[in-house]
């Protein structure tokens, strides 16, 4: 949005698309992450905490479905300049393109995640599959379809976003659990931390690999505003990593020792990390709106 508004002839539709895209990233990946958290830790959680995670997954899924529809409307506005937003030809062209493919994949995934709100026996399994489908939907369009190696970039996008989803989607449930003062809560926090470390390592490795594949030469990094968006995103991720390190090495051990107020301090810091993640999603949305300079790896239309 900000990058668009700084152009000589800014488009309100393009600016709106960045905002909607960022919100959609947040809602859909939180939904998927909550589903993954529920699958991994529901057996250890109290019933009330497990129900809270299911509500988060279902609520975020509903929000993401609404935002996905809003994204289509805004995209129609971008394609038509706003004048033909309701024209059938615009929607036909859009829904028969990769935009439509991504929408239907994401919708199927979000509906599967929303099954956690029901008493269906297989709902947790459907939700995990849905989380992976949501991650895959973002590889069905955008940069992963425009640059070589297409299959490699698409695979990295799915892996990267699945890891992002697990990390970010776990934050609100962890903040709720951090306020507890019992052995079960401490065990869940410790178990999550052990799993999260390799997940975050894969997240970082896949993200750096994607950056290297998209920007083939360092001297081309700032040839377009893509490099600025990438730099801001990396800075914000570094802030999240610093907060996560503080949780793992300072606040969580204090909570495990049941120090007075330690759980509340941990919960507040986790919520701050969740807030920073929203800025990461905004930076990612800005990046996707800009193409890196073609270094011979752009796929011809």
Task: Please annotate each region the language model reported.
Residues 1-301:
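Polytopic transmembrane helical bundles with strong interfacial aromatic enrichment
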């Amino acid at each position: 949005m900000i990058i668009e508004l700084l152009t000589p002839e800014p488009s309100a539709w393009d600016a709106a698309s960045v905002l909607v895209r960022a919100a959609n990233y947040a809602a859909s990946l939180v939904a998927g992450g909550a589903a993954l958290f529920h699958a991994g830790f529901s057996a250890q959680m109290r019933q009330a905490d497990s129900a809270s995670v299911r509500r988060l997954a279902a609520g975020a899924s509903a929000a993401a479905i609404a935002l996905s529809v809003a994204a289509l409307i805004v995209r129609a506005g971008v394609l038509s300049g706003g004048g033909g937003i309701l024209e059938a030809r615009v929607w036909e062209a859009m829904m028969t393109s990769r935009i439509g493919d991504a929408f239907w994949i994401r919708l199927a995934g979000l509906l599967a995640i929303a099954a956690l709100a029901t008493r269906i026996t297989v709902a947790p399994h459907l939700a995990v599959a849905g989380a992976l489908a949501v991650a895959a939907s973002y590889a069905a369009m955008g940069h992963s379809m425009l640059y070589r190696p297409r299959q490699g970039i698409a695979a990295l996008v799915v892996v990267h976003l699945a890891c992002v989803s697990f990390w970010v989607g776990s934050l609100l449930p962890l903040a709720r659990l951090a306020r507890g003062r019992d052995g079960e809560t401490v065990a869940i926090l410790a178990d999550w931390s052990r799993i999260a470390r390799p997940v975050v390592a894969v997240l970082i490795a896949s993200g750096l690999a994607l950056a290297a594949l998209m920007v083939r030469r360092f001297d081309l990094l700032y040839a377009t505003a893509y490099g600025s968006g990438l730099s801001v995103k990396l800075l914000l991720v570094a802030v999240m990593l610093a907060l996560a390190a503080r949780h793992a090495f300072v606040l969580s051990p204090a909570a495990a020792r049941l120090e007075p107020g330690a759980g509340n301090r941990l919960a507040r810091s986790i919520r701050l990390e969740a807030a920073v993640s929203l800025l990461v999603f905004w930076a990612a949305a800005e990046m996707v709106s800009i193409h890196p300079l073609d270094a011979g790896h752009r796929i011809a239309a």
